[in-house]
Amino acid sequence: MQKNILIIGAGIAGCSLAHFLANSGWNVTLLESEDGIAQGGSGNPVAAIYPKFMLNDEAYNDFMLKSFRFTTAWIRRLGLNEVDYRFDGAIEILEEAYAQKLEINLSRKITKKENFFSLINESILNKYLIECNSSGLFFHQGGWVNPIALCSHLINHSNIKIVTHQKIKSIEKSIDQWTLKTESQKTFNSSHVAICNASSVNQFDLTQHLHTDAFRGQINWINSTSFQMPPIVTCDEGYLAPLIQDKHVFGATYAMNDFNKDLRKSDTKKNIASIKKIHREFYNHCEAQKSIHGRVAWRASTKDRKPYVGRVFDNQLLGKMRVRELARFGSRGFTFAPYCSYVLTNLINDNLSQEDKKTLNYTNPERYRLKKMSLKKVASQVFRV
């Protein structure tokens, strides 16, 4: 029996899910509203991949750690061209007291921590050309990936069909299948649907209750410089990427529910200011430029920073929840989305591990609705672990 699924959205979430499903025997139709894949928040020249931990949120840190370890190991195995990814390390600059507290917390959680992270010291600063008075953490497996190269690689499969210029207007349920209608009056039918279109997911009746905020993000870049630059991803108030495709990318600004598509000089100035503590010479170089390239895109996020991964309730057919949600990854999309796509594939294939169930309980898309129904405990225990 053929297994067919429609996936709405061809960013990192949709492409990752298509990849895992196709490799497990599904025929996937990937529907994208733009003229190509990875055109939204997944379309920047580089995506930094490193774990962003919280000081007092153990559940979030567990999820972050699982996602980061899965994604970096998985990308290494994919067979991407060597110029399209690198995991030589990443530095997160933090206040010294905060870094020390975080180091203590992570040391309890991570075995063989010396292989995973280190407190920044003088030798690390010298090696990676960072300002000498900095403090923070060095993540040994952190790095970056070329987003478009990764997404293109993921959908290069005979079971995946890509259909662009398809802006989905509605999702409707008949007796045994879902019907997706586009603004151009086309229809697509399938027994299974996955919604992976970031902040646009609220447009559907089925998912309009899922809270989301759209964040406008602007990045900038400068072409290669004549002086030495840090060879790894370095993050402070903003991030600075190493030379990739003859560009040093840095940023990013974030503005909630701001839908201005134009590059802003004020945001460029903010991005330049955000790298001042990382590399003073590069900061001065950027300050002296008359014009700097950039890009604007939107990311979706939730109130609690947790993505939506799992089943969406069908109000009329609660027993047949064959619509899945995979969205709202915020700025951590390339860290979270591959792992969450893998877990969602296991849900669709009815092949969940105990760890998968823990993740789906944590990312349950219906958590806010269940809490409003005084079912807070149920929201985090949809799957028995």
Predicted regions and their residues:
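Dinucleotide-binding Rossmann-like beta1-alpha1 core, especially the glycine-rich loop
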Residues: 46-128
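C-terminal catalytic lobe of FAD-dependent flavoproteins
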Residues: 286-385
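Conserved beta-strand positions in the Rossmann-like core of class I SAM-dependent methyltransferases
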Residues: 29
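Helical element adjacent to the flavin cofactor pocket in flavoenzyme catalytic cores
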Residues: 137-184, 188, 192, 196-197
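Active-site substrate-recognition segment that forms the wall
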Residues: 6, 13-24, 33, 41-53, ...
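Helix-loop-beta segment of a Rossmann-like dinucleotide-binding subdomain
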Residues: 55, 81-92, 118-155, 253-257, ...
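Extreme N-terminal leader/targeting segments of oxidoreductases
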Residues: 1-5
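Short beta-strand to alpha-helix junction loop
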Residues: 56-67, 95-99, 137-153, 262-267, ...
